[in-house]
């Protein structure tokens, strides 16, 4: 029986194969609805048993995206924030691990009054509660992406919960969007619809009839195939959307709009119909497709074989380029290859900037230090993020301050000079006496910026700024005097002065040598590039033009 719903719900499912771009499609649709004046929020349901991705290998899962409130979430939450230009919270990412943990805890507390606890209704009710918690008088549409592929065992409780929500809030308040692959068979010379038909049949077998289907392919999709899918899957022709690969992820909203998906959704859900305001997004697309300059940035990391491990970093670099109408080419450099001066010279030859991203563990650290040394000695613009800042401190301590045994306790617990140490409230975690998951210094924290520094200039003269963090280690306060005496500028600290947040070199010594303990990439937007990345790309442009070489 239908009930009054303050928000409309749109569920996004995937079929045939994973990695079809459900998150990007959902984000693009969200952007279109927002550009029509609607208030949109988004959520991702992940079917894995981990409570969150915080302890997962980046090679398996990609980056961990941290929200303002300190949640470690799926990388798709980053897409949602960037496309909607909004800040989401922990409620935006729900996992099977969270659901089962909550249900089991309630059972132990006696909350089920002696019931036999089962997947239906207890697990599905918990899932529904998490989805409906996104409802608000301030939200017109909740877009919920259901991770995995239709047919996966792990996804079944989430799909059942979504089916029940449609039943409870009424079909006029709920929309199902299915994203499916049309594979191209070279011997036949055509795209095939049968896998999509089977995928929709699997959805219908569990009680879900999609309202629209987004067809993914590596080439244009003929109208005749769209008509066939409409007939065989019982979906209106206007609800069958062709979405071939686009030149840029930022083109996807235009593709979906040309196919009429946003208008179809608005009509089906009875939402207020307004024209799309393209002003902001057209400016982004103009900067994407009509750059006036070009720079190459070396991203020196441990997980470069899977670019998704650094997704927000690469998007922030590109957005920094948009601010200067500059195409940013990323050179992926495995940090192990920069261990020697010769290796660093070879790998970084011809780049206009070097970025050292975050990470964990000792592998590849000496290569990061080698890349930092090369950039510092050759005046190449350098930006260090989280672990990147810590490696910059290690390199400077060794090669400039004369502390040859300088290291981090994360990599060497017997380091002669532990210039990077374990945070006081993290020692029990490192010792294995407390849970590892969800216990780092996570979320939005403020920092005070020192006057007459590069970082303060980049932030527009602000005395205090807030950025998201994810770390257990910090620059050791015991070594701050010797580092500063050697010329390193500690340009930002926590409000109580106890934690180093930013380090840099004076610009008369190096054009751009800046490290941050935070993760500024997590707050960058294509429509609002982050000031640190804007400044970094500006320095790279100057270096490219031969005007950024330091005198001293």
Curated annotation (Swiss-Prot):
Mg(2+) binds at residues 76, 145. CTP binds at residues 18, 152-154, 192-197, 228. Disulfide bonds: none annotated. ATP binds at residues 19-24, 76. Residues 296-546 form the Glutamine amidotransferase type-1 domain. CDD domains: CTPS_N, GATase1_CTP_Synthase. One of its GO terms (molecular function) is CTP synthase activity. Keywords: ATP-binding, Glutamine amidotransferase, Ligase, Magnesium, Metal-binding, Nucleotide-binding, Pyrimidine biosynthesis. One of its GO terms (cellular component) is cytosol. Residues 1-271 are annotated as: Amidoligase domain. InterPro entries: Class_I_gatase-like, CTP_synthase, CTP_synthase_N, GATASE, GATase1_CTP_Synthase, P-loop_NTPase. Homotetramer. CTPSs have evolved a hybrid strategy for distinguishing between UTP and CTP. The overlapping regions of the product feedback inhibitory and substrate sites recognize a common feature in both compounds, the triphosphate moiety. To differentiate isosteric substrate and product pyrimidine rings, an additional pocket far from the expected kinase/ligase catalytic site, specifically recognizes the cytosine and ribose portions of the product inhibitor. Belongs to the CTP synthase family. This is CTP synthase. It comes from Thermobifida fusca (strain YX). The gene is pyrG.
């Amino acid at each position: 029986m239908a009930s009054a719903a303050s928000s409309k719900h749109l569920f996004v499912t995937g079929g045939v194969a994973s990695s079809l771009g459900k998150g990007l499609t959902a984000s693009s649709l969200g952007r279109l609805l927002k550009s029509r004046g609607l208030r949109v929020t988004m959520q991702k349901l992940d079917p894995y048993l981990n409570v969150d991705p915080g302890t997962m290998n980046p090679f398996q899962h990609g980056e961990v995206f941290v929200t303002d409130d300190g949640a470690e979430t799926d990388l798709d939450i980053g897409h949602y924030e960037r496309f909607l230009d909004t800040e989401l919270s922990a409620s935006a990412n729900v996992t099977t691990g969270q659901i089962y943990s909550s249900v089991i805890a309630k059972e132990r507390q006696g909350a089920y009054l002696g019931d036999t606890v089962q997947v239906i209704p207890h697990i599905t009710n918990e899932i529904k509660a998490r989805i409906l918690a996104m409802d608000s008088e301030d939200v017109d549409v909740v877009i919920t992406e259901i991770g995995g592929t239709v047919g996966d065992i792990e996804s079944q409780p989430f799909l059942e919960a979504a089916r029940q929500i449609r039943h409870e809030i009424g079909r006029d308040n709920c929309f199902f969007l299915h994203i499916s692959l049309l594979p191209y068979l070279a011997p036949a010379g055509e795209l095939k619809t049968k896998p999509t038909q089977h995928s929709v049949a699997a959805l219908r077998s569990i009680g879900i009839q999609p309202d629209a289907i987004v067809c993914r392919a590596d080439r244009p999709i003929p109208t005749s195939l769209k008509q066939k899918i409409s007939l065989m899957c019982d979906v209106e022709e206007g609800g069958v959307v062709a979405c071939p690969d686009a030149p840029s992820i930022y083109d996807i909203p235009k593709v979906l709009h040309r196919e009429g998906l946003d208008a179809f959704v608005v009509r089906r859900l009875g939402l207020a119909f307004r024209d799309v305001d393209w002003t902001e997004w057209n400016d982004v697309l103009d900067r994407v497709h009509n750059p006036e300059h070009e720079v190459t940035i070396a991203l020196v990391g441990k997980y470069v074989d899977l670019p998704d491990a650094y997704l927000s970093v690469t998007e922030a670099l590109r957005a920094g380029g948009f601010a200067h109408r500059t195409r940013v080419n990323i050179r992926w450099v495995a940090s192990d290859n920069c261990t020697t001066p010769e290796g660093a010279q070879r790998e970084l030859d011809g780049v206009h900037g070097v970025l050292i991203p975050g990470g964990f563990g000792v592998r590849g650290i000496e290569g990061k230090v080698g890349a930092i040394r090369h950039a510092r000695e050759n005046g190449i613009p350098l930006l260090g993020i989280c672990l990147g800042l810590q490696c910059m401190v290690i390199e400077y301590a060794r090669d400039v301050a004369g502390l040859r045994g300088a290291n981090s306790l994360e990599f060497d617990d017997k380091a002669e000079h532990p210039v990077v140490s374990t945070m006081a409230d993290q020692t029990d975690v490192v010792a294995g006496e407390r849970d590892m998951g969800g216990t780092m210094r996570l979320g939005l924290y403020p920092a005070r910026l020192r006057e007459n520094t590069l970082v303060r200039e980049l932030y527009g003269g602000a005395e205090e700024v807030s950025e998201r963090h994810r770390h257990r280690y910090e620059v050791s306060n015991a070594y701050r005097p010797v580092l500063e005496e050697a010329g390193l500028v500690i340009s930002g600290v926590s409000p109580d002065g106890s934690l180093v947040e930013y380090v840099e070199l004076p610009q008369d010594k190096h054009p751009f040598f800046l490290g941050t303990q935070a993760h500024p990439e997590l707050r960058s937007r294509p429509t609002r590039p982050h000031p640190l990345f804007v400044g970094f790309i500006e320095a790279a442009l100057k270096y490219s033009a031969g005007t950024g070489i330091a005198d001293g």
